[in-house]
Structures are given as C-alpha cells and as structure tokens.
Amino acid sequence: MEKSTQERFRRVIRVSAAISRHFESNREHHREDNNWLEMLFKELLVALKIHGIVIFKPDPNSVAPRKGNAKSLLRNVSPSVVLLVVSSSYGIHYAASSFTSLGRNPNGLLSLFSDVAYLFRIATALFTAFYMTSVSTSVSSLLSDSTTIFQKTLPPNAIKSIRGYVIGMFVFAFANLLAFLGVKLTELYQSGFDGYYNYNLYDLAPESKSVIYYAVPALDIAFCTIIITMPKWIMGFHVSVCKYLGCQAVSLSGTFASERVVVLKRAREFREYHSALCELIFRFDEIFNLVLFFWYADIIISFVLSVPYIIIRTDNSTPWTYAFVIIDVACNVALLVVFNMAASDPGRLARDAQLVVLKMSSRADPDDVRLNHELLLLANAVKVAKVEMSGWNCFDVQRGLTITVLSMLSTYVVIVYQMMHHTL
C-alpha cells in the first residue's frame, strides 16, 4: 500500500514536470516568434512605444514584482494611459485657444480652416490612441499566430520587401512630423513669442522673459506636433502589416504552384494554410476596419480644409510656411494612395489561389478519387474566401477607386482656386 502511494506521487511529479516543460517550451517558442517580428517591424514599433503604444508587451513572468510604494505605482502606470490623458487634455486646450483667439487674431477667420482641420486631426489622434490601446494585445496575438502557423517560411526577397516598406513608412511619418513642426515654428517666427501667447495661449504671457517665457510655447508646439502626427506612425504600421500579409499570400501561392507532382497531403496542406491565412486577414480586418474610416476622414478633411488656407494665405505667409503646409498636404495625398495600394495587397490571395488550384488540378491524377475530392474542397474554399474578402473593409480596394478619389480631390482644388481668385 505504501509502495503504491509512493509510486502514485512519483507519477504525479513526472506528469507535472512534463507539463511544465511543455509550457516552458511553448513560451520560449512564442518569445522567439515575437523577437523575430520585433526585428521585422522594429523602427515602427520603437516609434509607437515612444508614443505610448506597446504592441508586444513583455512577458509578465519575466518581470520581477515590485514593492507597492508610490514610486512603483508610477512605474506601473501604462504609457497608453498617459498618452490618452495628454491627448484629450491637449484637444480641449487647442479647441478653447482656437475659439478665444478668433477675436484677438487679425487672421482668425482666415486661419479658421486650418484650426478646424487641426481639431479634427487631434480628435483622430485621441480616438486612434484609445483604440490602439484596446487592440494592441489582439494585434500582437495576430502577428504571433501568423509566424507560428507559417513557421517563418517567407523567402529572403519577401522579407527585404517588407523591411523596405517599414523603413519607407518610418521615413514618411518622420518627414510628416518635420513638416508639421516647420509649420508651427514658422508660425512662431512670424507672430513672435508675444503674438503666440496672444493667439494660442490665452494671452497669458509672463511679465519677465525668463526660461518659462520661452519654454511654454516650445512645449505647446512639441505637444501639438507629437499628438497630431501620432496617427501617421500607426498608419505606417498598418501599411507594413498589410504588406506582410500580402507577402505571406504570395509566398504560399508560389510554394504550392511550383510543385510538379500533386499529392493528397500537399493539397490538404494548401487548403489548411489558405484557410489559416484567410482567418488572419479576417481578424486583421476586424481589428482595423473601424479606425480605418477615421483615418480616411482625417486625410480627406485635412486636404479639403488645408487647400483654401493655402490659397488665402499665399500673400500673407512666409515662403517657408507655404512650403511646409504644401508638404503636409502632399504627404496626406501620398498616404491615401499608399494606403489603397497596401490594402489591396492581401487581396492577391483570392486571385493567386485560384490559379494555384487550376495548376494543381491540371497535374493531378484523374483516377485518384481522394485527391480529386480534396482539390474540389480546395476550389470551393477558395471561392468562398474570395466572396468573403470582397466584403472586408480593409482589403476591398480597387485601382479605380483610388483614381476616382484623386480625380475628385484635384477637381476640388481647381474649383476652390477659381472661387478664391474671383472673390479675392
């Protein structure tokens, strides 16, 4: 009896040790996947982390617990919470200062277009920060699952293409930040510190020109620039992930289309991989389809309201102000085009998969009943995925839609210019 009890305890200990080793290996594998993804998107992830949005959170088991004093509580405050508080506070401040400056600013009515555009961009930044705070875990899980499912099967040229997109979007977002910073600095240079206090800081300039006198406008410009350009980093990350999913689709189709001999196992693997990738794209669409509408609205409204401001202020602004505003508008239009191009990239899966099925069917043995049945299931799965993908908000993008939007915007510019030319 005593021996059987000891044997039972030993068995329980062995099973517990095996379970712990299993979970530890899974945790290590998951951490390796995250490290690989962090290296793939490292520039944009660092920029998002600076802004308070953390996609890949650290493992809670690897973080040592801290004592419950006031200093540790401040350390444990999420940076995203700080971002939300700062964004909302600055949005209220900017709305109030814009409203109160209408009576004091001689160009108040002329700058009303840009003020409304900036208010909407601040509101978009606040909503984006709140939304990304709530879905950052889902985005991290989606990217980790994609690496686990496809086991890092991306070819080197696909990885190089994704890295090019990541670096390009990083440079683009940073250029947009510099352009907007240039707009605010030239505004400060043109109005002077006293004028900046009068128009943007409720005419609360300190009497003595101390460090605070120069620091407050600098902080105001820094906060405004960081908050308004913050969504551009997230848009760049969204475009890069679209490219990543598109490369997964191209790699998957190319791998199976190049096989000369079709067997039952490979046909079933293609159907499973195709379904898994469609599920990942569907999850990505569910995560970003809501905020995508606000991003498009932000881009178009900024363009629509900035064009009259540029035309009205041509004779009153310095060449640098004019140039920086044009760069900011051009970045928004370029982002609209890049957005549509990247969003249509995962849609290759629906087109290329049909070609792969046709190639596999032409090479299959007509007498192999099980293989042909599997190919029939694969063809049906591809057709169903194509129908579902046509209703996904993030990826139902056509070239004609982009051309139509750009034509409408260019027509709008011409009409506004003619109207302003005859009015002024």
Where are the model-predicted features located?
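Terminal membrane-anchoring module of integral membrane proteins
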Residues: 2-81, 167-175, 264-424
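Membrane-cytosol interface segments
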Residues: 22, 34-46, 114-124, 128-144
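Cytoplasmic membrane-interface regions of multi-pass membrane proteins
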Residues: 61-63, 138-156
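Helix-loop-helix junctions within predominantly alpha-helical proteins
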Residues: 81-118, 149-236, 250-265, 307-334, ...
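Amphipathic, non-membrane alpha-helical segments in soluble helical-bundle scaffolds
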Residues: 110-113, 136, 212-215, 235-242, ...
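Generic structural signal for well-ordered, non-membrane alpha-helices
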Residues: 121, 144-151, 247-254, 272-275, ...
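Inner-leaflet juxtamembrane helices
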Residues: 126-147, 235-249, 332-360
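Short intracellular "coupling" helices and adjacent cytoplasmic loop segments at the cytosolic face
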Residues: 130-134, 154-159, 254-267, 359-372
